[in-house]
Amino acid sequence: MSKQLDLSKRLQAVANLVSPKRRVADIGCDHGYVSIYLADVRKCPKVIAMDVRKGPLSQAQNNIHRFGMDDRIEMRLSDGTALLEPDEVDTLLISGMGGRLIMRIVSEGLDRLGAFKELVLQPQSEAELVRKFLREHDYIIVDEDFVIEDGKNYPMMKALHVSCLDEWDRESGQQHDAFTLFDYSVKQQDLFGPVLLKKRPADFCTFLDQKRKKTEEILQQITQPEKRKEMQDYLQQLIDVSKGM
């Protein structure tokens, strides 16, 4: 590829979570830049760029052609994983969607196709529900990142099916058991991310600080007892996990 592809901070972080040389389905590919990056830089031998809308898929196709990647990336007009075949990809990548939609797409894929080796997810909302969903469906979060871009918070995660953990240990040189954090409750790990709590990237620490201050402000305005108790509990969670900063 002769042209230079510059990804946004968020998309670069998402792309970096995809393991190199894997077959990838990019669900909701939008403009196709991540698919192009994966095929070129991450050396993924098979990339399927998928979107439910004709407009974004057409734009992605134009970009893929512009970067000379027509023979490296396949395009499919598909609602989620509907047009994927069993064992066609190793990695399912979904970014820029709400948490509940991501869970629905993954759940439908698991029901129809069986377990994917790797899930790379960037939920725009309800990341804690996505983490809980992964845990309940035999996926272990082995890496995470957190990006603040244009004033918006973007958590993202890589999860492997339990059947693939030994393979990941060998390839990465890490032990997945190292991500078990006994200092934090399951609730705290779901809320804030087990690997984020361990790695503490700069944007994540900024998020925790801003979230704590905002929660304190909101708490002063709440008078309804149940809502106040709920907000106090959340503030305490923030204070507890922030102690490691």
Which ranges hold each PLM region?
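Conserved class I S-adenosyl-L-methionine
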Residues: 21-30
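S-adenosyl-L-methionine
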Residues: 54, 58-87
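Conserved alpha-helix/loop element of class I SAM-dependent methyltransferases that forms part
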Residues: 5-21
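Class I S-adenosyl-L-methionine
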Residues: 2-7, 100-245
